[in-house]
From Swiss-Prot:
Record InterPro entries: Ppm1/Ppm2/Tcmp (IPR007213), SAM-dependent_MTases_sf (IPR029063), SAM_mthyl_Trfase_ML2640-like (IPR011610)
Enzyme Commission designation: 2.1.1.-
PANTHER family: S-ADENOSYL-L-METHIONINE-DEPENDENT METHYLTRANSFERASE YKTD-RELATED, S-ADENOSYL-L-METHIONINE-DEPENDENT METHYLTRANSFERASES SUPERFAMILY PROTEIN
Protein species of origin: Mycobacterium tuberculosis (strain ATCC 25618 / H37Rv)
Protein name: Putative S-adenosyl-L-methionine-dependent methyltransferase Rv0146
Family: Belongs to the UPF0677 family.
Residue sites binding S-adenosyl-L-methionine per the record: 132, 161-162
Swiss-Prot/TrEMBL keywords: Methyltransferase, S-adenosyl-L-methionine, Transferase
């Protein structure tokens, strides 16, 4: 059960979900036609010790094994893998556009096992600030350093809780509020209550000068019936793989029905925003998965929002 001040490392709670995401990036990297390349994702997964359920995501036959349950379960597993690749590619492109426009200050909110500070080709002078729980940041930087991996930008860790006074910690790490910034909230908002989401964007806006940019993945809305169905399906997948499901992601997510539309909120608070539905972006890059349930429900899938400070 989540609390307002809960904490975690890379093996527990919200921290462990970063391992799942990294596993999807590793699988994508191994494809003959990858949308993105993350040469460090597999390393970060296999050293995390977060449990067999997450390492099983590296299995190239996972979709076929899920098909033994039923076609819809296989489609869901394939969708989750494809979605992570498309999401990563979308935000990689966002950062490429930001630095092409001259932005040299980047802040990744709840960075988890995000390896962009290491794998992207950043212009000289770029500083990437990563905000997350202290133990999550420490695991990533230590693991990569021990394997000879160095950042491709000036990387600065900001150990802070995004539900607390993280802007002060960011400034203490060297953040310049007078410089244009490219912000990213990827894989984050669903783990925040609705009011915390609004507060986060208010805090971002307070330290963003005109010309700053932000990109965010929205939190899709699922009813209790759908959540129960998803739990049952993932338990079946775990049973087929013969492994214990140690974390219920649905218990970590806040399913607030009154959560504000990110694009609308930003538009109302001094940003010029646009959004792209995840299914539309997946189709655009040729990675939509047929057979995914609720494909026609506009609230069931995330949106990718980008905005510029006015």
């Amino acid at each position: 059960m989540r609390t307002h001040d809960d904490t975690w490392d890379i093996k527990t709670s919200v921290g462990a979900t970063a391992v799942m995401v990294a596993a999807a990036r590793a699988v994508e990297t191994d494809r003959p036609d990858p949308l993105i390349r993350d040469p460090y994702a597999r390393l970060l997964v296999t050293n995390a010790g977060a449990g067999a359920i997450w390492e099983a995501m590296l299995d190239p036959t996972l979709v076929a094994k899920a098909a033994a349950i039923d076609a819809e379960t296989a489609a869901i597993v394939a969708y989750l893998r494809s979605y992570q690749a498309v999401r990563t590619n979308f935000f990689d492109t966002y950062f490429a556009s930001a630095v092409a426009a001259g932005i040299r200050q980047v802040v990744i909110l709840a960075s988890g096992l995000d390896s962009r500070a290491y794998r992207l080709d950043w212009p000289a002078g770029t500083i990437v600030y990563e905000i997350d729980q202290p133990k999550v940041l420490s695991y990533k930087s230590t693991t990569l350093a021990e394997n000879g991996v160095t950042p491709s930008a000036g990387r600065r860790e900001v150990p802070a809780d995004l539900r607390q006074d993280w802007p002060a910690a960011l400034r203490d790490a060297g953040f310049d509020p007078t410089a244009r910034t490219a912000w990213l909230a990827e894989g984050l908002l669903m783990y925040l209550p609705a009011e915390a989401q609004d507060r986060l964007f208010t805090q971002v806006g307070a330290v963003s000068v005109a010309g700053s940019r932000i990109a965010a993945e929205t939190a899709p809305v699922h009813g209790e019936e759908r959540r129960a169905e998803m739990r049952a399906r993932f338990k079946k997948v775990a049973d087929v793989l013969g492994i214990e499901q140690t974390i219920d992601v649905q218990e970590l997510v806040y399913h607030d029905q009154d959560r504000a539309s990110v694009a609308d909120w930003l538009t109302d608070h001094g940003w010029r925003a646009r959004s792209q539905r995840a299914p539309d972006e997946m189709r655009r890059v040729g990675r939509w998965v047929e057979g995914v349930p609720m494909a026609d429900d506009p609230t069931a899938f995330a949106e990718f929002v980008t905005a510029e400070r006015l």
